[in-house]
Amino acid sequence: MGLAFSGARPCCCRHNVITTDGGEVVSLTAHEFDVVDIESEEEGNFYVPPDVRVVTRAPGPQYRRPSDPPSRHTRRRDPDVARPPATLTPPLSDSE
C-alpha cells in the first residue's frame, strides 16, 4: 500500500494524522509501525524511529529574519537630529 501526502489538499494534516488522496485517514504514531533493520532492507520504504535516525549532512547556515518594524510606541532617535537641551531645573535648597 503506498501512501502519498498531497500538499494541495487543505486541512489534510491533524495531530499525528494525515489524510491520503484516497480519503483514508492514517495515524502517524510510532506504535503503528514496525521497526526494521536498515541494513537488511532493500531500497524500499521503511520507518526509522527519530532516536535512530542519522543526519547525513550538517545543517546549513541559519539566516536571521529581518526584524519586525518597530512598535508605534517605540521611538527611534535619528542620529542626525540633535538632542533637545535638558529642561530639568536644579533642585531648590532650603534657603531659597
Swiss-Prot record:
Chain positions found as Phosphoserine: 40
Superkingdom classification of source: Viruses
Annotated segments matching region Asp/Glu-rich (acidic): 37-43
Annotated localization: Virion tegument; Virion membrane; Host cell membrane; Host Golgi apparatus membrane
Residues with a covalently attached lipid (N-myristoyl glycine): 2
Topological type in the membrane: Lipid-anchor
Post-translational modification: Myristoylation and palmitoylation (probably on one or more of the nearby cysteines at the N-terminus) enable membrane-binding and Golgi apparatus-specific targeting and are essential for efficient packaging.
Composition-biased stretches (Basic and acidic residues): 65-81
Start and end residues of each stretch annotated as Disordered: 50-96
Subunit field text: Interacts with cytoplasmic envelopment protein 2; this interaction is essential for the proper localization of each protein to the assembly complex and thus for the production of infectious virus. Interacts with gE (via C-terminus). Interacts with gD (via C-terminus). Interacts with UL56.
Protein name, per record: Cytoplasmic envelopment protein 3
Natural source organism: Human herpesvirus 2 (strain HG52)
